[in-house]
């Protein structure tokens, strides 16, 4: 059987995960996560992990919030899961909206040297002492190319600083000169881009639902771990605002409104990235039904649904 992969991506709250769960009801497949926050355990509500994780769901909630994780480590894990799916003759369906993970999947990763733990510690301590804005300015002062990074993307600016400190060379230079080897050749990339008004309404409603369930308890759990605010899991949608609410710095509804606004802005940036950074043969869909119908039409005959599934 041909080694195929389907990638279903899109902005936060677009409905891609729900679409994949519906696809899995009619297709013999594995749903493999490529969301950089849904990898963490202990925060399923905050990170909007599948409500009922089945044996077909892979790479959800398996990383400790305190663990230092990266797109490179995720790529190793996803290669293993994809190979296992192929060995079991089921279709790997990779879903999530994290640009770093999607980019590493479709374009590969540059061969940047490993960062010394002391360099990483120094960079993180400097970020904590300076704050995000001043840290970004310090980075740009040393590497003008870093101005191309978004100042609120803490992970990227921290990574750029670490690489510059470790190697003396801009991360952009590494990206340009290091050959990227694509991990997979036969990826069909599908993007779910609902109309903006529907997407924003879904974001607003989803965050209210999160706040009414266990999101606050999950943030309390993260705070009990004494994680720095620049830790990746602390950047989950709503986490910074809930922390401020729990610390008495803002009111409940203010936290809700700020989180909704920040998430809408993030979704807007995601939409721009999907339209400009993905391969030219990427296909775009405006509704769940369209993307579900496409996947089933393309793959149902090759991967018919069976009553028993491998439990690897």
Curated annotation (Swiss-Prot):
For the ligand (ATP), the binding residues are: 10-17
InterPro entries in alphabetical order: Dimethylallyltransferase (IPR039657), IPT (IPR018022), P-loop_NTPase (IPR027417)
What domain of life does the UniProt record list for this protein's source? Answer: Bacteria
The answer on whether this UniProt entry bears the keyword Nucleotide-binding reads yes
Q: What is its EC number?
A: 2.5.1.75
Q: Name one Pfam family in it.
A: IPPT
Cofactor(s), names only, from the UniProt record: Mg(2+)
What is the recorded name of this protein? tRNA dimethylallyltransferase
Which species is listed as the source?
Anaplasma phagocytophilum (strain HZ)
Q: Which gene encodes it?
A: miaA
């Amino acid at each position: 059987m041909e080694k195929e992969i389907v990638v279903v991506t899109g902005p936060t709250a677009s409905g891609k995960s729900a679409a994949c769960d519906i696809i899995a009801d009619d297709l013999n497949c594995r749903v493999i996560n490529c969301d950089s926050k849904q990898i963490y355990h202990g925060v399923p509500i905050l990170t909007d992990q599948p409500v009922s994780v089945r044996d077909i769901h892979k790479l959800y909630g398996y990383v400790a919030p305190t663990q230092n994780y990266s797109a490179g480590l995720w790529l190793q894990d996803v290669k293993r899961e994809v190979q296992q799916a192929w060995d079991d003759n089921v279709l790997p369906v990779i879903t999530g909206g994290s640009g770093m993970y999607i980019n590493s999947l479709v374009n590969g990763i540059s061969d940047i040297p490993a960062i010394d733990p002391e360099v990483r510690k120094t960079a993180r301590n400097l970020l904590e002492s300076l704050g995000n804005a001043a840290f970004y300015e310090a980075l740009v002062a040393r590497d003008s190319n870093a101005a191309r990074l978004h100042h609120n993307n803490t992970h990227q600016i921290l990574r750029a600083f670490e690489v510059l400190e470790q190697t003396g060379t801009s991360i952009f230079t590494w990206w340009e000169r290091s050959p990227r080897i694509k991990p997979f050749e036969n990826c069909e990339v599908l993007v779910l881009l609902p109309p903006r008004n529907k997407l924003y309404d879904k974001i607003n409603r989803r965050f209210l639902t999160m706040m009414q369930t266990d999101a606050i308890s999950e943030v309390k759990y993260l705070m009990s771990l004494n994680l720095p605010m620049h830790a990746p899991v602390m950047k989950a949608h709503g986490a910074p605002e809930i922390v401020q609410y729990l610390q008495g710095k803002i009111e409940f509804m203010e936290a809700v409104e700020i989180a909704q606004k920040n998430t809408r802005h993030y979704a807007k940036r995601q939409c721009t990235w999907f339209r400009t950074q993905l391969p030219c043969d990427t296909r775009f869909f405006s509704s769940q039904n369209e993307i579900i119908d496409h996947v089933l039409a393309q793959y149902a005959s090759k991967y018919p649904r069976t009553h028993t599934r491998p439990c690897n």
